[in-house]
Amino acid sequence: MTYGFIGLGHQGTPMAERMIGAGLRPWLWARRSEVLDRYADADAELAATPAQVAAEADVIGLCMYDADATDAVLWGPDGIMSAARAGTVLAIHATVGPAYVQDLAARVATHGVHVVDAPVSGGPAAAEGKLLVIVAGDEEPRARCTPMFETYAGRVVHVGGIGAAQAAKLINNSLITAITGLVFDAFDLGTALGIEQDGLADVLGSGSAANPSVPVYAAIGAEEFSIRAWPTLHKDVALVESLDLPATQLVDVARATIADMEIRRADYVASRSTT
């Protein structure tokens, strides 16, 4: 089995490096040549185009930022689908929404190509091989992806048919967003009540309310947190809002958090421009 990986950004780089470290010798491609040049001496094959990755690899992991970037790699000039062979498996790691992967699976099936819906969660855990990979799709293509997934995943969880993994990831990220908003509120309340912030961070980070947003807030504050996290969380909450869903408190709180983060981002930028 030959493997390929496209999408050497913040999330994809440690995933590809785990594949290299495990001896899979993946075919790699990046839009910027300087990114690909970092792997000149690595145990990997460097492709000139996405089409070359498709011509050489049986299983290809795609970790692009969004649907537009994924489409560009698949269908653009010298894209994957210009050279993909029947039986090729595409593992879609980007968070792009259920409709996108369902449409993609139907579209590439006419070429004999398979899609595995496989968004990831965990961020920095990729470098340690401890990502959560949420998978959906047919068993045989999933099985072919397993050796690749095992290099960067601590857990691989199957949740159903194509689109179910995207839906699960969107629920996960909506919950993260909502929790983040409540963490902001908790610290704002603590300030109003005169509680020392480091002490409150220790309480919230050590007790029953502990969650990943608390230590991040404690380290960088709400404004910097918003600067860093807003683009991705905004994208994912917008995907949730595009679904035909009943009204839920989860989505309402997530939406309110995105609006609050946008205000905090603007305030932060304004404060920096006047100093």
Feature names for model-found ranges:
Residues 164-275:
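Helical "substrate-binding/catalytic lid" subdomain
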Residues 50-55, 59-131:
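Rossmann-like NAD(P)(H) cofactor-binding subdomain of soluble oxidoreductases
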Residues 15-19, 104, 148, 189:
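Hydrophobic residues within alpha-helices
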Residues 20, 40, 109, 150, ...:
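Anion (oxyanion) recognition and catalysis
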Residues 1-62:
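NAD(P)+-binding Rossmann beta1-loop-alpha1 motif at the extreme N-terminus of oxidoreductases
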Residues 95-173:
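Rossmann-fold dinucleotide-binding core
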Residues 26, 46, 114-116, 156, ...:
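Hydrophobic beta-strand scaffold residues
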